[in-house]
Amino acid sequence: MKLTIERAALLKALGHVQSVVERRNTIPILSNILLSAEGDRLSFSATDLDMEIIDEGFAQIDVPGQITAPAHTLYEIVRKLPDGADVSLSFSGDDPRLVIQAGRSRFNLPVLPAGDFPVMSSDGLSSRIAVDTNELIRLIDKTRFAISTEETRYYLNGLYVHTVNEGGETKLRAVATDGHRLALAEMPAPEGAVGIPGVIVPRKTIAEARRLMESAGETVDLQVSPQKVRFEFGAAALTSKVIDGAFPDYMRVIPRDNAKILTLDNDLFAKAVDRVATISAEKSRSVKLAVEPGRITLTVRNMEAGQAVEEVEVDYDGEPFEIGFNARYLLDVCGQIAGPQAEFRFADPASPTLVVDPVDPGVKYVLMPLRV
C-alpha cells in the first residue's frame, strides 16, 4: 500500500472514527484503525465490536492495499503535522510497519493484518428515513442528559427512538429516563418513518452520532432494524447494535392532570437553584421549594455547611405547598428550556412534576420529588 493524502482530509476522517476506539483494549486489533486504499479513496474504519464508524477521503493511490495501525497514535501524529502538509502512507509486506512521511518528519508504526479486523454487518437494515439534521440534534440534546448510567438497568442505558401516532399525526419521538427524571422530545415524523421498529440506542452511540452531526449536511440518513441502527452523514457512517431489552411504559409516569401550574423566569430560577445548592450535601443535593402565591422560597440545609435561602418571584395563585427536588436534576431541566420562561405543573409533594417549555411544546420533562 502506498498513497499520498492532504493532512486536512486525513485529520478530518481520523477525527471522525478514532474516538470509538477505547484507550484500553484486551483485544489488540480493536486498538487499531483499518486503512483501505483503492481507486482514489482512502477509507477508514474503527470499532469496539458494539459500534463501527467508517469514513473516507480523496487520496492519490499509487499502490492499493489494506492494513491496520494504532488509532490514537496515528491521529496524534497527523494532528501535530503542519497545516497544508501532504502526508505519505506506505506499507509493504517486507516490513511490518506503516511508514508516515510529511516534509522532514518520518514515523514508523506497528501494524496488524487487515484480515483480522472485525467488520460489522449491515444486514437487516431495511428501514431508511432522511431526518433533518437540526431536528435530530434537537431530539438528542433535549433528552440525552436523562439517560441512565446504572448498568444494572441496562435497558435505560440508551435513548428510546420510536414513532407514535397521536391525534392522527405521526411523530418521531426520543425518550430517556433514569428512574428519577424523564425527558421526552418529538418532531413530525419524516417520510417513510411509519412502521420503523422502536429501538434503544446506546448512550455511547448517541454521543458519537451527535458529534458527527456537527459536520453533517442538511439531513442524516437513518436506517433501523430491531438489532441495529445506522446513521449516515455523507461519506461517514456509524453502525451500532441496539440495546436488547424492553423500554418501560413511560407514558404511565407522565402526569396528565397536574392542576397546580406555576410559571417562572427560567434563568433567574436556575441561578437561584445553583446558588443555594452550593452548600447542599453531594449525595442528595436536595433543595426544598416552598411554593405560595407570587413566589417560591428555595431552602437548602446541610448539618455541616449551614443553610441557604433565596426567594424567586413566580406566577402562581394556588394553594401553598412544599416539595423537594434534586438540585442537579432541576438545573439539567432548566438548561434545556429554550424560551425565557418555564412552566411547572404540580400535583402534590409526593407525585411526579411535569415541566414544559412554552416555546417548544414538543418537549416534556418529568421530575420525581424528594422527601425534604
UniProtKB/Swiss-Prot annotation:
Cellular component terms (Gene Ontology): cytoplasm; DNA polymerase III complex
Subcellular compartments: Cytoplasm
GO MF annotations, alphabetized: 3'-5' exonuclease activity; DNA binding; DNA-directed DNA polymerase activity
Nucleotidyltransferase listed as a keyword: yes
Family as reported in the entry's similarity comment: Belongs to the beta sliding clamp family.
Complex and partners: Forms a ring-shaped head-to-tail homodimer around DNA which binds and tethers DNA polymerases and other proteins to the DNA. The DNA replisome complex has a single clamp-loading complex (3 tau and 1 each of delta, delta', psi and chi subunits) which binds 3 Pol III cores (1 core on the leading strand and 2 on the lagging strand) each with a beta sliding clamp dimer. Additional proteins in the replisome are other copies of gamma, psi and chi, Ssb, DNA helicase and RNA primase.
Protein name: Beta sliding clamp
